[in-house]
Structures are given as structure tokens and as C-alpha cells.
Amino acid sequence: MLVLIPFKPVNPKTRLSKVMRKNERENFARCMLLDVLDALSSFDCDIKIISTHPFKIESYDVVVDSRELDDAINSRIEGETAVIMSDIPLINSRILRRFFESEGDVVIAPGRKGGTNMIIIRDRKFKVRYYYCSFLRHLEFAKSLDLKCTVFDSFYASVDIDTPDDLLELMIHGEGKKSYEFLYSIGFRIKYEKEPKLVRISNTFP
């Protein structure tokens, strides 16, 4: 299986800029990518990181493509292709095994806010359409092509990290992950209240 992982190494995750400096966001994005790659490490996949800028990571094939995400992905779909986002660090090999074994011409793991966090494409007629509630758009497109579409249900796969609120989920569930360790190292902690909150106790920001 071909696995494509989109990645933005330069000035990523701008919605986290209120709680992280630019260099911290870049390091954090890399840690999340490494968590995703760790989850994939036990599978015999052809992994390609589709990066918006030149970027090196040992033992992996990085392809630089500055086009819009849809174009960068659709031009590389071949045979059985999975697209896995680089900002879902809570996934693990057990989740991926269930995902890869799911039946269907198209298998979609939705994000919590209507996005598409993972997708398997087994029919080349299908093309990705990211953003603008891509989960529903992908369902509708598969239906229009008369393709069997399976929705893959996984909480951990649904947690993509974009906003400060998302960081709380990672700090609650992500112990042992590189991205969790990075957040902890720069002072993020959980404040135990009736509704847990995320606080930063060191390396005062900004």
C-alpha cells in the first residue's frame, strides 16, 4: 500500500500561535509527524511524506510539492493508496491495522470537526477534496461514483491537533508520544478542575 502523509514544516499550525512560538510549532509538528510514522513502522508500506518545503527526515522519502493539497495528493494516487494526516499523533498500530483491514472502495476516518483525517482509496476514479467539511464531501463524491464507502470509527484517529483546545486532548491521552513529551518539556500541564484545562507553567509565553 502507498501511504501519503502531507506535511508543512515551515510555520505550521498557525492557530496555535497564541500559545506557541514559531520554532515551537515547527518542532511540535515534527514530533506529531514522528508519532504518526512510529504508528506506521510495523507495516510494510511505501511511505511518502508530501512536504510543502524542503525537509529531511532519516529513512523516509520526502517529496516537495507546493501545490494545493488536493492536487499534490490526487496526482499521486495509484492502486491502493492511503492518505494519513501528520497531525493525528494519538493513532497507534492497532488502530491502523483495523483501518487497513476495513473493506470498501473508499474508507474514511473522519475528524471531530468534519475533516478527513485518514482515507484509503482503492478505486482511482475517486479524488480527494479536502477542506470545507471534506468528510461529507468525500461521502457524497463516493456515492456519486457508486463506490462502496466505509466510515472508520476511532476516537484517537479523530483527534487532529489544530487549536489550543486540541492540545488538551493530547495531554490527556498521549502519554508516551513524542508530541506529548514535547508539550510537557515546554511547560504544558493539565489543570484538574471540574472541566480540565491546559496551562503552561514554565517557559513563559510569549
Curated annotation (Swiss-Prot):
Domain of life assignment? Archaea
One annotated GO molecular function: GTP binding
EC number(s) recorded for this UniProt protein? 2.7.7.68
Q: Which Gene3D superfamilies match?
A: 6.10.140.50, Spore Coat Polysaccharide Biosynthesis Protein SpsA, Chain A
Q: Which InterPro entries match?
A: CofC, Nucleotide-diphossugar_trans
**What residue ranges are annotated as transmembrane?**
none
Q: Which UniProt keywords apply?
A: GTP-binding, Nucleotide-binding, Nucleotidyltransferase, Transferase
Q: What class of enzyme is it?
A: transferase
The reaction(s) annotated as catalysed by this protein in its Swiss-Prot or TrEMBL entry are: (2S)-2-phospholactate + GTP + H(+) = (2S)-lactyl-2-diphospho-5'-guanosine + diphosphate
Which pathway is it part of?
Cofactor biosynthesis; coenzyme F420 biosynthesis
Q: Which Pfam families match?
A: CofC
Q: Which proteins does it associate with, and in what oligomeric form?
A: Homodimer.
Indicate the family of this protein: Belongs to the CofC family.
NCBIfam families recorded: F420_cofC
- HAMAP family for this protein: CofC
> What's the name of the protein?
2-phospho-L-lactate guanylyltransferase
State the organism named in the record: Archaeoglobus profundus (strain DSM 5631 / JCM 9629 / NBRC 100127 / Av18)
Name of the gene = cofC
